[in-house]
Amino acid sequence: MSAIPRTSIIMPVYNTASTVIAAIKSVLAQTDPDFELLVMIDGSPDNSVQLIAEYLQQNPDERVRVFNNPKNQGLSAMRNQGLDEARGEWVTFPDSDDALYPIFLERLHYHAERTGAQVVNCAHNMVATDGSTTQRLKGAPGTLTGQEAAFALLKDELSPYAWDKIIRRELFEGVRYPQIERAEDECALLDCYLRAQSVTVIDEPLYAYAVSAGSLTWSRITPLSETRRLLEYFEKSLQRTSTYHLLAGQEALTIARVIAYLNNAQQALIVGGESAPAVLAGCRAGFTVSDALLALRIRPVFGAAGLLLKTSMPLYRLLYGAYVKRVYNL
């Protein structure tokens, strides 16, 4: 491994003993060998630590560094620690229950060199518990300016994930993952896009994302206070740049607000429980009919869902629920 590897691969580990070795193997099988793997153990209560130690003892690799944090600190803290330790020119953040296809790095770097982009997004395969796969790509293949990518991200037109892309590490100077209970990936990514010159999207599925009920956004109800914190983060990020005063920036923030409350409401419908009615009421009050009408013009699915949430809960439950199940392979 060179003193400065091309890519730092930062992999948080928490309670994934059944999958973490396969995830590590998928990294070590990359056709582009110029990387370092930072395994960030987050106070995992299972035997992940032992399994990783045994595997690396039997298969030593100088490219792998393990950071065993005895106390659980959360996903954002692990990624931030990894960024502090990273030496690579690029970074990526695979989950320890997923897998990179062997050409993940090779193909993403090829397109980075081809376009000069500072971020390259790829498609991914969603792998269901029965082994079936569904390919998913958010965004049309091509290259956007950083500003265009930031607005597209807020409008749910680009992938908000940390694991299906490579990012120039320099974009993280002064940027870290916030301690927010939802969409921390999207928060940091928004800040990176606002700093980037260009962002490329490719339609090659290079990542296998394991769909499991325990890891889904839809397995718990996010407190309304966290949704408000998320939206405040988006607004402050744009306020730090000239994009905040642009009409396109304000429209993107409005659509992000509608989407955030729609998803929060859908969580409440799926999970249920005593808190669900209050959360649903808060989500309905979180945006205006004018907001939903704006979304209807630019992002029709979300605009229509917003109007239904405001006016007809049964229809909202039926139609937006079907959309969520299709998009997230539930």
Residue ranges, per PLM feature:
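Catalytic core of nucleotide-sugar-dependent glycosyltransferases
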Residues: L206-S212, S219-E251, L262-D291
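General helical secondary-structure elements
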Residues: S2, L75, I103, G116, ...
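Structural motif
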Residues: Y244-I255, L296-I298, F302-G306
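Membrane-interface aromatic/basic loop that binds lipid-linked glycans or pyrophosphate carriers
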Residues: L269-L330
